């Protein structure tokens, strides 16, 4: 066992011992293995600047951006796992053939989606103004072995960012992003769909003409052709749900996910997380800065997103900020978040065995004394996979994962 894994096991054992008095001690029997998905010899990919993870038919597909060693170049890497993240393929440099700059970074991450043998990867490149630029699509039709250049969802060279990507059971790829095509000084939430893995895009439309300008968005698709987009609205900076019941052809703003009526003339740089259980229950984790209510909250919907439960505070008073959530089945749900502490930001995990009514005592996943942030969590065949970054002494960020069974 590596020093990293041994250290993580000891940390987890101590955390589990502290959680014995939890009203729902769901994580006490969990087996958690922490390591980096990247091999030690993947030297050029160790300094992570962003990442995304996607689950397709039980297999995991990841894309990362990284600062190349001794270079200002940002690399793009693809890797996959067929055993829930216990073992990963060697990272494949998929960006070098296209020689395009990368503006995507943590909080505005590169994105990946998969459907069968098809993969689509999208990132924000550099346009006329540094720090801004349009989206770039590349795709593979052979399980990620070879890659080709796709098209921009609008064919325009305007600034496009904070995108999310998902594939449905029919092989359609759905994309949302933010842009200011009306040039009215604020961003709108946009959508497009591709039936050929990003070679062409159709149904380009606006879902909301005014949204928060720098918070990430999250897509949720199901087998019935429903597509959901979780995003932060503008007039009140609460999270909102837009929904399509015809595979993206028509949309409506369905609901507010946590009605805090938060008025804020700025951007918190914080989106949310959304997941659907097998029985149809939708779970979400969101953050608000509303006065006397600031913090992270869990909500759930039993009527397909039309209405939501009362917000349930997550680790109240702990500084919980960026969060994600994943429903394994109709009863088991896990949340992950980062929280600011005296020694920097830490990554915490809690899970529920009763569909979100009660949660385990938060469990520390990240390394003690090292600042960790931007966690993600997805379901696997046997549990969950969590991913996050940890900032090292030289200010570079390393990528870590926790296999949770």
Segments and roles (model prediction):
Residues 2-10:
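Bacterial N-terminal signal peptides that target proteins for export
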């Amino acid at each position: 066992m590596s020093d990293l894994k041994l250290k993580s096991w000891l940390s987890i054992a101590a955390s589990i011992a502290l959680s014995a008095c939890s009203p729902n001690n769901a994580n006490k029997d969990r087996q958690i293995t922490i390591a980096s998905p990247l091999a030690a010899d993947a030297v050029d990919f160790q300094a992570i600047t962003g990442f995304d993870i996607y689950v397709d038919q039980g297999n995991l597909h990841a894309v990362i951006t990284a600062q190349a060693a001794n270079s200002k170049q940002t690399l793009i890497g693809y890797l996959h796992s067929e055993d829930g993240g216990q073992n990963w393929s060697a990272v494949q440099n998929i960006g070098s053939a296209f020689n395009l700059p990368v503006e995507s970074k943590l909080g505005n991450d590169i994105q990946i989606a998969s459907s069968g043998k098809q993969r689509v990867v999208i990132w924000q490149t550099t346009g006329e103004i540094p720090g801004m630029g349009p989206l770039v699509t590349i795709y593979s039709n052979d399980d990620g072995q070879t890659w080709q250049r796709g098209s921009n969802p609008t064919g325009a060279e305007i600034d496009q960012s904070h995108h999310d990507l998902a594939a449905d059971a029919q092989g359609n790829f759905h994309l949302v992003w933010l842009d200011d095509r009306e040039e009215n000084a604020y961003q709108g939430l946009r959508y497009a769909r591709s039936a050929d893995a990003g070679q062409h895009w159709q149904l380009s439309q606006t879902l909301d003409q005014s949204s928060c300008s720098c918070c990430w968005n999250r897509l949720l698709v199901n087998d019935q052709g429903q597509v959901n987009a979780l995003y932060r609205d503008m007039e009140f900076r609460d999270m909102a749900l837009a929904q399509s019941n015809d595979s993206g052809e028509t949309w409506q703003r369905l609901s507010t996910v946590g009605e805090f009526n938060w008025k804020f003339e700025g951007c918190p740089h914080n989106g949310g997380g959304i997941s659907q259980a097998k029985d149809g229950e939708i779970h979400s984790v969101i953050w608000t800065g509303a006065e006397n209510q600031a913090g992270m909250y869990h909500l759930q919907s039993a009527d397909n997103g039309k209405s939501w439960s009362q917000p349930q505070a997550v680790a109240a008073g702990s500084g919980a900020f960026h969060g994600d959530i994943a429903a394994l089945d109709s009863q088991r749900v896990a949340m992950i978040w980062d929280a600011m502490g005296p020694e920097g930001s830490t990554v915490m995990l809690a899970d529920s065995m009763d569909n979100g009514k009660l949660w385990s005592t938060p469990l520390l996943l990240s390394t003690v004394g090292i600042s960790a942030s931007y966690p993600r969590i997805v379901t696997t065949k046997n549990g969950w996979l969590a991913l996050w970054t940890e900032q090292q002494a030289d200010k570079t960020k390393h990528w870590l994962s926790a296999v949770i069974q």
